[in-house]
Amino acid sequence: MPSFDVDSIRARFPALSLTHEGRPMAFFDGPGGTQVPDTVIDAVSRYYRDSNANAGGDFLTSRRSDAVVAEAHAALGDLLGAESPAEIKLGANMTSLTLHVSRSITAAMDPGDEIVVTRLDHEANVGPWLSAAADRGLTVRTVDARPDDVTLDLDSLDLALGPRTRLVAVGWASNAVGTINPVAEIARRAHAVGAWVYVDAVHAAPHLPIDVRAVSADFLACSAYKFFGPHLGVLYGRRDILEALPTYKIRPAHDRYETGTGNFEGQAGALAAVEYLADIGRREATSAAPVTDRRAALVAGLTAIRTYEMELYRRLADGLERLPGTRIHGIVERHRFDDRTPTAAVTFDDLSPAAVSAALGSQGIATWHGDFYATGLIERLGLAGRGGVLRIGLTHYNTAAEVDRLLESLATILTARPAAAASV
C-alpha cells in the first residue's frame, strides 16, 4: 500500500495555513468538529452560485437542487454501508434527528417497556431517550462504564437486558475518551431479546469505516461536521422499520423524517466530504487491491486514515506517559489500541484541564476541556468537580511534528505549573 501522504492531505485544508502570533495553528480539536477540505468549501459556494432554489420545481436551479439531494443521500448511504439511499435521512444535526426519531420509535412502546442507555455515551444519545421515556411511562436502564479502562461493562449490559427491552442506545466510540465499543456484539445481545439498536457514530465516523449492516444496527446517526463536512445531521434507519413507524410532521409524506426545507448547501458540502474520503481510498488503491466503486474507495480511504492516525496516536501516548503528573483516561495498553480512536482524555495532578487548554491555546494549539456532554461518564470517573479532562483529538491531517510541538508545550506548561496556574 502506498505510504500515507499527509503533506498532500494538508494542502487540501485551507485552515491549516492559519497562524497565531506568527506560529502555525495546530488543530487537535477534531472531536469537537474537524476542518474542511477545499472541495467542501467549493461545493457549498458552487451550490449558492449555480443551484440555489427550493427542490421540486420545473426549472434549472430547482432541478440542480433535486440532483444535489439525491446525490448526497446516495453518497452518505455509501459512507455508512446502507442498502439504499432511502435509508438515509438528513437534518440539522445528530441531536435534532435523534430527538425527532425517538418520538417515532417510542410511540410503538407501552408503559413499562424498557430502554437501555449507557454511561459512556454523549448526552445526545441519552437525553432524548430519557425525555421520551418520561413522556411514555417507560423504564430506562443504564449500562455502567468501567473506571479502570473506561470501557462498557458488558455484564452490566446483560443485567439491563430483559423481555421488555425495546431499544438499546449505544455509541460506536466515546467522544470523550476514545473507547470503541463492541457494537456488533451489543447488537447481537439486544436482538436476542427483541430490541432495536440505535448507534451514535458521531465520533467514530471520521476515524474508521462504518458498516451498518455488518454491525446489525437498526438505526445509526452521525454528523457531517465531524467527518470534514458542514453542519448536517445524518440518520440511517433500516428501511422496513422507517416505513412502519409513525412520524411527527404536519402531513406525513415520503420525506416525513426530513422536516421543512432541507439544508441543500449543507448536503452539497456533505457530498463533497464523502467524495474527499473516497478520493483518499482511490489513491491508496493498488493493482493487488483495486477500488471498484465508491463504497470500496471509502473503506480503503478510512482504513488508511485509521492506520496513519493510530501510528500518530502511539507517538502522542508515548510522550504523554513521559510527562510527570499526567494521566490518560481510557485504554492505554498498546495491544488494545484497536479498541480506541486517536483521542486522548488527560488530567494533570496540579493543573486544571481549563488552565492547560488555555495555555496551549495561547500558543496556537487547539484542544478542548470539560465533559463534552459525556456528562455521565465524567461523573462516573469522579472528574466532574475537577473540570473534566483535557481532550487531545488527532485526525489524519495532523503530523508527527505537530504532536511533538504539543508535547513540548505541555512539558513547558507542566514545568512552570505554578506560574501557569496563576496566569490562567
Question: For the regions a protein language model found, what residue spans apply to each?
Answer:
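Pyridoxal 5′-phosphate
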Residues: 1-424
